[in-house]
Amino acid sequence: MADRGDVLTARRTFGFGRGDSLEHFIVLQSASFPGISDTVVVAPIRKPLPALAAWVGNVPIALGSGATAKPMVIVVPLLAAATTDRFEPEVAGRADPRTMAAIDRVLRALLALR
């Protein structure tokens, strides 16, 4: 089971338009949530497209490290449930606490939580 904040790589990319595909997702679900199924709640990570630049639900993240790090955004409002078999078994990365706090702020606003 993947832990909250883990970056997962899709076994096959998910297409969302011409030339656009989603390869990486971040786990939003707590690892302490009862695992009654092989489903995990994730949000897509994508290139920071100009059309989405002002979208409140985007949280910046860098995939990779050092000079090879690629600036990306987590599109939190597009959260979804997916079975774990849709992802590679190895974790591709991990979000830092500051990124997770930003995700939490978006989730609270999106779901009208206090």
PLM feature segments, named:
Residues 1-114:
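Conserved functional hotspots at enzyme active or ligand-binding sites that engage polyanionic ligands
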